[in-house]
């Protein structure tokens, strides 16, 4: 996909790579921005916090971290498996600029991305509150759909529901 330099690989590695890319751009005086997406369950990984600490230390204001905060991971609800909440307060404690949004509201997302571009001297974290599978009755807020693709019948049923919205 054009503009996507890499997939994240194992949990926690994406943000580490993003921090490296953002730092390299700063050192090269390149004004490109780096965006990375984390799952809330992924924030259980220590590497996420090491990378965040580095991003803040190096004042990587060209880095925007978007956290998909849906409280679901492959083995259960994040707050029951190993709670990482409150995410916003944790990222603030690591000296990041934090913006909380409804992850299903495009206007809020656009405004947050604009605010991130305008923030200087620190990385921005957008904590996007979402509902996994939103808009598809049999997928919505269901842990079992984590990492599972729908079969053809399920796909058509899901698309029918989404097109009706």
PLM regions with names:
Residues 1-165:
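Glycine-rich ThDP/TPP pyrophosphate-binding loop and its adjacent helix/strand module
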């Amino acid at each position: 996909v054009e503009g996507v330099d890499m997939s994240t690989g194992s949990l926690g590695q994406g943000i580490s790579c993003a921090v490296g890319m953002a730092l390299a751009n700063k050192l090269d005086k390149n004004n490109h921005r780096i965006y990375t997406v984390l799952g809330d369950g992924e924030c259980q990984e220590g590497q996420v916090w090491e990378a965040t600490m580095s991003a803040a230390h190096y004042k990587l204001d060209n880095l925007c971290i978007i956290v998909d905060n849906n409280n679901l991971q492959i083995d259960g609800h994040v707050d029951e498996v190993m709670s990482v909440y409150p995410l916003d307060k944790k990222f603030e404690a690591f000296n990041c600029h934090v913006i909380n949004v409804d992850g299903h509201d495009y206007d809020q997302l656009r405004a947050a991305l604009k605010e991130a571009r305008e923030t200087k001297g620190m990385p921005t974290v957008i904590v996007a509150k979402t509902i996994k599978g939103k808009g598809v009755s049999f997928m919505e807020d269901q842990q079992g759909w984590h990492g599972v693709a729908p079969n053809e019948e399920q796909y058509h049923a899901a698309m029918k529901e989404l097109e009706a919205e």
